Regions:
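Compositionally biased, low-complexity linear motifs
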Residues: 1-11, 143, 222-234
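FAD-binding core of FAD-dependent oxidoreductases
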Residues: 1-6, 207-213
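Short, local alpha-helical segments
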Residues: 175-182, 211-219
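Activity-critical C-terminal alpha-helical subdomain
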Residues: 214-253
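Short glycine/serine/threonine-biased micro-segments
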Residues: 203, 210-212, 247
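C-terminal substrate-recognition/cap domain of FAD-linked oxidoreductases
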Residues: 2-5, 11, 15-195, 199, ...
């Protein structure tokens, strides 16, 4: 854990792209530019629509910089130059798309619980992949999950956003919303979860990016985890938590 001074300076913008491919290239260049934005989240057109941040025709890049030391105008200006080089536009909006998305994001757990009570099947899954493999991976995941949603629920909505971007690659985060059948929602969810997880591993992604490693992911986590790392984790668990208090039976037996 690292304690940092509270930011005194902030600079932010929302950039829209007519094409998701252009937005992805802009996010990649930003991640590899050395500018180190504090926030660089890409909302695909479906994610923008479902969150109310857009009308579903454009992708939106939520961009922000923070510092406790200096003004950030030059950093933001250079980031916007990069976005403009990939046909990104800062458009005049009645409301700030970033603020709209942030509000929906914070309400997400409450909305999810409400959706479930109304009979909706809701699922999210996050992964990570290198930039050079992203497009094949993304198209494969979309195809597999859409087919599973059609088979399990008759159809639904599927969206994607980049939760994080790194010089090596993005961390795509997918959301699924589909109609449930009373009494069969869990089976429908299982079918979608299985298809998504199998596709992620088959296409070279990681079963989870940095959180949500737990019982739901265990079959794929164990398949992906190197045996040596598993033994090292088991040994550390026995040494540091001999009573098995912390997450018993989750990452290790």
């Amino acid at each position: 854990m690292r304690v940092q001074p509270r930011p005194r300076y902030r600079a932010a913008a929302s950039v829209s792209f007519a094409g998701f491919a252009d937005a992805v290239q802009a996010a990649r260049e930003l991640a590899q530019s050395g500018l180190h934005p504090a926030n660089c989240r890409l909302l695909g057109p479906e994610e923008a629509l479902l969150s109310g941040s857009g009308d579903g025709s454009r992708s939106i890049l939520v961009l922000g910089f923070e510092s406790a030391d200096h003004e950030l105008g030059p950093w933001l200006a250079r980031a916007l130059e990069i976005c403009a080089g990939h046909r990104g536009e800062v458009r005049d909006e009645d409301s700030d798309p970033a603020a709209v998305w942030r509000a929906v994001f914070l309400r997400g757990p409450h909305l999810r619980d409400g959706f479930v009570r109304l009979g909706l099947v809701a699922e999210t899954f996050e992964t990570a992949i290198t930039w050079d493999r992203f497009w094949e991976f993304h198209q494969g995941v979309l195809a597999a999950v859409r087919q599973a949603v059609r088979q399990a629920c008759g159809g639904g909505a599927l969206s994607c956003r980049f939760a994080y971007v790194y010089p090596d690659g993005p961390a795509p985060y997918y959301s699924v919303y589909a109609p449930g059948r009373p009494g069969q929602e869990l089976e429908q969810w299982d079918q979608i979860k299985l298809a998504a997880s199998e596709a992620i591993l088959a296409l070279g992604g990681t079963i989870t990016h940095h959180h949500a490693v737990g019982r739901d992911h265990m079959p794929w986590y164990r398949a992906q985890r190197p045996a040596l790392f598993g033994r090292a984790l088991d040994a550390a668990k026995r040494a540091l938590d001999p009573a098995g208090i912390m997450n018993p039976g989750v990452l290790t037996p």
